[in-house]
């Protein structure tokens, strides 16, 4: 019994690492817009999204203000910045907003900047909600001391997205 529990624990740790701690990242590409998701590590996401639009990967930045509106809507020369409050104020609301906005503007590609541990859930929701091609470029990893909380939170959010509240 102990061996089985240890094997299950090791599998859980390995899966957590693969999905949440070291998520697969796409290479930045030229796209119709960059979507910056909101969350507790907002400054990492904002910095990454701003760097991508400043480097010319897109001329439009969709900036979610969600639960953390203390981060002001950024201003970027020669870039259209669309700040929005998603409804619902969760990742699914952000992805749904971006999908509707993209359809309205006939966009085919978006680059999404999720929180590092949020990458797997962002990919899941993009596959459900966005009809075009999505490039996922996660923000920098959170500080090591925040990682256990973020991994635990993300497991709950991922289960919710899979089972309880699938969205789109």
What name fits each language-model region?
Residues 20-152, 156:
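A structural signal for short, hydrophobic/glycine-enriched beta-strand patches
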Residues 1-17:
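Hydrophobic membrane-insertion alpha-helices, especially the h-region
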Residues 16-21, 161, 165:
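Structural signal for membrane-spanning alpha-helices in multi-pass inner-membrane proteins
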Residues 150-168:
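Short hydrophobic helices that act as membrane-entry/anchoring signals
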């Amino acid at each position: 019994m102990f061996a089985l529990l240890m094997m299950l624990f090791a599998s859980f740790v390995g899966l957590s690492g693969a999905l949440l701690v070291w998520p697969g990242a796409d290479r930045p590409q030229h796209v119709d817009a960059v979507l910056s998701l909101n969350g507790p590590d907002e400054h990492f996401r904002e910095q990454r999204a701003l760097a991508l639009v400043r480097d010319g990967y897109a001329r439009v930045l969709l900036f979610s203000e969600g639960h953390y509106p203390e981060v002001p809507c950024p201003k970027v020369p020669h870039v259209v910045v669309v700040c929005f409050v998603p409804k619902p104020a969760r990742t699914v609301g952000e992805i749904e907003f971006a999908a509707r906005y993209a359809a309205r503007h006939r966009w085919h590609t978006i680059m999404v900047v999720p929180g590092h541990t949020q990458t797997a859930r962002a990919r899941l929701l993009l596959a459900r909600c966005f009809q075009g091609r999505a490039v996922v470029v996660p923000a920098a990893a959170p500080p090591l001391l925040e990682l256990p909380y973020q991994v635990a939170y993300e497991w709950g959010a991922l289960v919710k997205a899979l089972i309880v509240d699938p969205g789109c």
